[in-house]
UniProtKB/Swiss-Prot annotation:
Cell division keyword on record: no
A cellular component annotation (GO) from this entry: cytosol
Entries under HAMAP family matching the protein: NAD_Glyc3P_dehydrog
Domain of life of the source: Bacteria
GO biological process: carbohydrate metabolic process; glycerol-3-phosphate biosynthetic process; glycerol-3-phosphate catabolic process; glycerol-3-phosphate metabolic process; glycerophospholipid metabolic process; phospholipid biosynthetic process
Protein's name according to its UniProt entry: Glycerol-3-phosphate dehydrogenase [NAD(P)+]
Major subcellular location class: cytoplasm
A GO molecular-function descriptor: NAD binding
Cellular compartment(s): Cytoplasm
Length: 328
């Protein structure tokens, strides 16, 4: 961003609010855009996102608006912090010369990567932001780290400068598919971990699930050109640990609710892993890949298996060596 210009943060949910606060903490003024004018007006007045991030006050450096053209006016790039299903509509309303930083951990409606979808619309400067980042902790200024990946090193460096502070380390990467898809797939594994919690399967089961889930992530990501180092980095293993174990995690909580026979919906908040499971399962079937944990979650969320049946299918797979080539 140019000196003194505000960083557009498009999306005033919990994560968008936390990123706007993080930018201000780094000395970067921010413009937080909310889709609903009434919500934006209330947020601007009370200076606290009581619906999505209660207890975190907006600093003076964060302005709030519902005017999208005004929010991005004069900006070099913007953070897009809306659920994946809302990204296409938001992209359609943005100037193509704007750099876009995609912060959702999901897929486009057609199952493609959001970065590919943005490039297909004519955006030449695209980045993705991902890591073990719970909004509740980032907003409070607790220590954390994240990764911004882009084929445009200047864009990645600019995002790093805008967000890096004593409480948030920002690393750069050129591995866009690895950083982007690690955040997508770990959500599904976290749903499975939550189901295990809801079924009271114990620590051994969770450790097994996360270890085999990481192997599943590695096979899937590397088949799409990701680097193995990324899989075991912040946006892969790091995000998996945070999402599969934390009480803040929507995906883990949704899986636990399903296992208990309750609704996985959480006050209107989007649970990316529930939608992504079906898209990833369809991709695996179409391309001849075996993603057993993804398949189990997809079958359960479609109502074709119960959580207990999902466990039986996973535990009943054929015997094999732990590290057999090509096997998850």
């Amino acid at each position: 961003m140019t000196q003194g210009s505000a960083l557009p943060v498009l999306g005033a949910g919990g994560w968008g609010t936390a990123l706007a606060v993080a930018a201000a903490r780094a000395g970067q003024p921010a413009r937080l855009w909310a889709r609903r004018p009434d919500f934006a007006a209330r947020l601007a007045e009370v200076r606290e996102n009581r619906e999505y991030l209660p207890g975190v006050l907006l600093p003076p450096e964060v302005a709030v608006t519902s005017d999208l053209p005004g929010a991005v006016a004069g900006a070099d790039f913007a953070l897009l912090v809306v659920p994946s299903v809302g990204v296409p509509e938001l992209l359609a309303g943005l100037p193509r010369e704007l750099g876009v930083v995609l912060c959702a951990k999901g897929l486009a409606p057609d199952g493609s990567r959001l970065s590919e979808y943005a490039a297909g619309l004519g955006f030449d400067r695209v980045a993705v932001l991902s890591g073990p980042n719970h909004a509740e902790e980032i907003g409070r200024g607790l220590p954390a780290a994240t990764v911004v990946a882009s084929r445009d090193p200047a864009l990645a460096a600019a995002v790093q400068t805008a967000l890096m502070s004593p409480s948030l380390r920002v690393y750069t990467s050129r591995d866009v598919p690895g950083v982007e898809l690690g955040g997508v797939l770990k959500n599904v594994i976290a749903v499975a971990a939550g189901m295990g919690d809801g079924l009271h399967l114990g620590d051994n089961a969770k450790a097994t699930l996360l270890t085999r889930g990481l192997r599943e992530m590695n096979r899937y990501l590397r088949s799409l050109g990701a680097e193995e180092e990324t899989v075991y980095g912040l946006s892969g293993l790091g995000d998996l640990i945070a999402t599969a174990t934390s009480p803040h995690s929507r995906n883990r909580a949704a899986g636990e609710a399903i296992a208990r026979g309750e609704s996985p919906q959480q006050g209107g908040k989007v649970v990316e892993g529930l939608r992504t499971a079906g898209l990833l399962d369809a991709w695996a079937a179409a391309h001849g890949h075996d993603l057993p944990i993804v398949r189990a979650v997809a079958q359960v969320t479609r109502g074709e298996w119960s959580p207990a049946e999902g466990v039986r299918h996973l535990m009943g797979r054929e015997a094999k060596g732990e590290t057999e080539a090509g096997e998850p």
